[in-house]
Amino acid sequence: MASNPMYQFNVYRIGPEIKIGEIDLSFTNASLFMVLSSLVILIIFNLGSKKNIVPNKVQLLAELSYSFISKMISDTAGIKAKPYFAFIFSLFMFVLFCNMLGMIPYSFTVTSHIIVTFVLAAFIFVGVTIIGFMKHGFGYLKLFVPSGVPMLLLPLIVIIEIISYLSRPVSLSVRLFANMMAGHTMMKVFGGFVVSLGIIGGWLPLSFSVALTGLEILVAFLQAYVFAILTCIYLNDALNLHH
């Protein structure tokens, strides 16, 4: 069973079963790694917030992360998005550390499950939509009416824009889920080849495994970045009503 590349994505209960009616609230391995990701973030930035005359490596990492996200928000959503810095920063870090913890052997990749990524994406979608209506009222609906479109094509374009808008949580969640699941599946497959072929024939898949691991670490960062920057783009639409 452990040789099955899909076995690593199984969700199983840790501890007693907790159910309210038909709703299962049991603590699972997915819950554990979400909690661990949050704790690692809290520990790192708690250590990084200490005021030392000479910054240590943790402080430098915290400051670099702060500057990176701050610049991303400014470049993508503008000065009006600054009040939402804490949310974007927390979102990026949570997705990043969930991805990175999944790189540890025999761990669990939370973001390889569509239910996790979709809940995050749906929360962003609903939140951005609320911000848009609070900022512009029903004028927010102008987002679906591009300027300069001939009246004859306008009904079709509006329908396309609405469908595109409603598909945002789907595309945002599937992109992260699919990349993480595909990458970890390939790593497991090549790892299985190394074990099966042994010392003599296993050097080639081992080389691929090492290269794939490095690539997957890069993908883990890029997917967190893409998730955060798309959130900034959606926020920019809500705040500035650009099309």
Predicted regions and their residues:
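Selective transmembrane helix interface/packing segments
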Residues: 1-243
